[in-house]
Amino acid sequence: MQRLGSVWKWMGCGLIVGCLLPNAALAAADSLLIEALDVEGGAATLYITPEHQSLLIDTGWTANFGATNPDSAQRIIAAARRHGLSKLDYVLITHYHHDHVGGLPELLSQFPVGTILDHGPSREVPPPDVPPAVVPFQPAALYPKYLEAIHGHPHRTLKPGDTLAIGSLHLTAVTSDGVTIDQPLPGAGEAIAECASMRPMDKDGGEENARSLAVVLTFGRARIAAFGDLTWNMEQRLFCPKDKVGRVDLFIVSHHGSNLSNSPAMLRALAPRVAVMDNGATKGADVETYETVSKAPRLKRLWQLHLAERADAQHNVPETYIANPGLSGDEHVSIEVAVTKQGGITVTNDRTGFSETY
């Protein structure tokens, strides 16, 4: 089956009209192509500009853990080659949890990579009761391996407010290392009513989550929010009492859809038209998040990488909008997105070739 990156023509399906294409969604040569890879509850999202420059956000799990047969790095490399890439220009690591940074050493050893972007040093210390078998997969153990792996590569630590142009794709860091931008981005600054009832949360899933390098990506008039595993309390600082980010067109649902993130205040502020959730079959996609995202103003459609097995049918999207609906043993199918500079969004389920345009 041909993918977005291998066919550079456009076939319109109409505004919010679904269609079944024989080979997957066909995209114009001036579109931004996005592939949300299935790395079994980890994170790995590939962005390819019309200039054929590339950005990978996160790298999934280490080999033989999480995503296996093939592992996360192999899935990323296969996607890059499928889209005609011989190099990944930028790899951005949002934070140093195993499901986000684990695949990087294997990736760097097997495929050319340019510049590495991150939030700076890991500061998470393993809890005293962590089982010995888990210690090698904690940030304290993974971060030294990360530094060893990126040695010799161009490396940039992004701070809040830093920007980067990747061809016609423009990146702005809105949080990094537990710090938010000081001033609202252009078009932001609205008071968010949901802030009045928002209370701090005493759980964060690990300190590195709160230190996620969260970015807003701008492509023409289109805006995309990709916040890694940014936590509820950091969202409160970023969106309350006034929104510092502004509305977006596409939202990569934070933290795999965990209820430790994805506050009503953030969804009110971002008001995405389309959301893609990179959940696993039994990881993320919490009921509270499903309800919050589904109620976001302007939302036309939520897509899921997996059926959320812990939720009922009312808290999963219809199977048409799920890339991997099977109970275990899926085919690691991606969700692909084509974004135009005018803000048009076409999302394709690679399992079926079904596309919908918004």
Residue ranges of model-derived segments:
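Bacterial N-terminal signal peptides
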Residues: 10-23
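Non-globular, low-confidence helical/coil segments that flank catalytic cores
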Residues: 2-6, 10, 25-358
